[in-house]
Amino acid sequence: MTTTAIVYSDEWRHFDYGREHPLRMERLGLTWRLMEAYGLTALPRAKVWAPERAELEEIARFHSREYIEILRAVSAGDWVPNAAGYGLGPGDNPIFPGLWEAAQLGAGGSLLAARLVADGEATRAFHFAGGLHHAMPGRASGFCYVNDAVLAIMRLRQRGLRVAYVDIDAHHGDGVQFAFYDDPNVLTVSTHERGDRLFPGTGFVVEMGEGAGLGYSVNVPLQPLTDDAVYHEAFEAVVPPLVTAFKPDVLVIQLGIDSHRTDPLTHLSLTVQGFTRAVKRLLPLAPRVVALGGGGYDLTNVARAWTAAWAAMNDVDLPRDLPRESHRDMQRLGLGILSLDDPVETSPPDTRRWAEEYARRQVGEIQDRIFPLHGL
């Protein structure tokens, strides 16, 4: 029997990247309220857990102590003249009060999800405030200060577990790839908008790992305007075969929904139902699953997608019409059709062909270069 855990804290409402920043903490409370309205926070086989802030020593397993001290200093309001050298300052990674505590909370939630799965207290755990996959050992990057995904995988590896990481965010999961680039015990797979069109500028097929880890970093770059049909053709051709061949003990999935067709920062063209299809395809690929959030800058997409993902983790079929209790939130944020699913739209033939041809070339390269290294 599947037992599940969801990790959530309303403490997130105390943190704020700034009024003009696209990453809005409001999305977390909005998601939680939609889950509540659907009855998903009181399921009989699911337990709600509150995260504790990660200790400095846990964060230092991946991040340098020098960088951690800089984070603590700027968070406390100290003047750090070289903060920009650590990726901190106006723009993507602003300095705000409580920055360090927010980073600790995010890391703590993902570490808790990993522990619950490793200890057998849950077969599937979801920390939707996590998935901040860009942070590097010594610098912030892409709205991410501490890489909770890396820390969660490290905790699972401490237990001797073999881990596959699949990242379906629109942005390449560069920080996670970097952390395990030479490690054959961690398979990282990222599907994302091509790096020459979108931050962070990486994630090409030729980034395959190195040394003992050669073939264990897999990237599926996609053309802007890639829709559900093109995405799933590429996804099916690459992800299930490689994950199945790898035989992970635990699957860690990063569920960024900035791949959505109305996301303001990216250029892919998935729907909520296309996203959910990918989640449902991933869940059976390993006996245990740790799910994390990620990108997503249209708040109604975030709430609907992560609610649908949590329902899938619990094998619950949801009504397509959004619960009445959620209508005020959704209408306030501009959602026109009060449905869990998006209206069906057909890509123009030239756009579909352009995306399809590019995706098929990437898949062909992966099958030629990486599949043989896994006996495929």
Model-derived features with residue positions:
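N-terminal low-complexity, Ser/Thr- and acidic-residue-enriched intrinsically disordered segments
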Residues: 1-61
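A general "terminal functional-core" signal
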Residues: 1-8, 13-16, 70-376
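Low-complexity, intrinsically disordered regions enriched in charged/polar residues
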Residues: 25, 53, 61, 65, ...
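Short amphipathic alpha-helical segments with coiled-coil-like heptad repeat character
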Residues: 39-41, 67, 119
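Cationic, histidine-enriched alpha-helical/coil surfaces that engage anionic ligands
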Residues: 47-87
